[in-house]
Amino acid sequence: MRHPDFPSAVAVPPAWQASLRLRFAARGERTVLAARQHRGPLMVQKPLYPEGDICHAVILHPPAGVAGGDTLDIALHAEAGTHAVIATPGATKWYKSLGRDASQHVRLTVEEGARLDWLPQENIVFDDARARIATELSIAPGGSAIGWDAVVLGRQASGEQWNRGVLWLDTQVRCNGHALWIEQSQLDAGSPLRGAVAGLDGMSVLGTLWAVGHGATQELAESLAERLPYAAGLRAGVTCLSSPAQSMLLVRVLGRQMEAVRHVMVDAWSALREPIHGVPARPLRLWAT
C-alpha cells in the first residue's frame, strides 16, 4: 500500500511549445526583417548589418536547452531579392527526456532571386535524450541557400557518453515541390551502426552542410574535395546532386571533436559562399566569442 505522501511516479515538468515566424523582404537594395511572430521562449534579436545590405539575425532560445516534451517550430521566409544570414548564439542542448520526445522543426522558404545562409551552432545530445531534429528547405529556381547542422552525441566537455536515448534526423530539400534530397534516419544509442565502419565508425560528432544554387556544379565539388580532410579522427566528403531546376552540393563530416568538425564546416562555407551566392565569405562575429 502506497503512502499518500510518496507518489509512485516522478513528477514531470511542463513542456514548452514554442514557435517563431520570420519573413525577410527587400527594401531597395537592403534586406529587412519585415515580419516576426513568436510564441513561447523563441525570439530574434534586432537585425544587424555587418555586410552592408545583408540582414543578419540571431535566433534566441532563453531556456538554452530542449527537454522531453518540448517542441520548437521555426519558419523563415526569404522573399525575392533578399539575403538573410541566420545564426544562433550557442549550442542547442537536448536534455534527458524522462521518457518523452523533444523536437525541433525548421522550415526554410527561399524565393527566386533570394539568398539564405542558415548557420546554427551544434546540437548536443545528452545521455537519455530522445531528440527529433527536422529541417525542410523549399527553394525556387534562381534562389540559393547554404545551411548546416551538426550533432554531438554526449557531452564531450564533461566526459559524458551517450549510452541511452534515440536521435531522429529528417532533412528535406525541395525545388518547386520536387525533391532534391530527402534523408530520414533513426539512431539508437545502442545501435551497432555507431561503431561500424559503414556507420559512424566510433565517431561522436556528425555534420552535414548543403549548398543549393546554380553555382553548385560538379567542378565546384571536385575543387572543394581537395581541401576536405580524410584521417582516422576526422573525415569529410562532398557529393553533387542535380535536377533540371536546381543543383546542390552535400558535404558530410565525421569527427571525434566538435571543434575540428566546426572548422571543416566553416572552411567549406567560406569556399562555397561566393560561387553559390555571389558574395564573399565573412566569418560571423558570433564565431569569435
Swiss-Prot record:
Family classification: Belongs to the UreD family.
Name this polypeptide is given: Urease accessory protein UreD
Keyword entries, A-Z: Chaperone, Cytoplasm, Nickel insertion
Subunit structure and binding partners: UreD, UreF and UreG form a complex that acts as a GTP-hydrolysis-dependent molecular chaperone, activating the urease apoprotein by helping to assemble the nickel containing metallocenter of UreC. The UreE protein probably delivers the nickel.
GO molecular function annotations of the record: nickel cation binding
UniProt KW Transit peptide keyword: no
GO cellular component: cytoplasm
Organism: Cupriavidus pinatubonensis (strain JMP 134 / LMG 1197)
Gene behind this protein: ureD
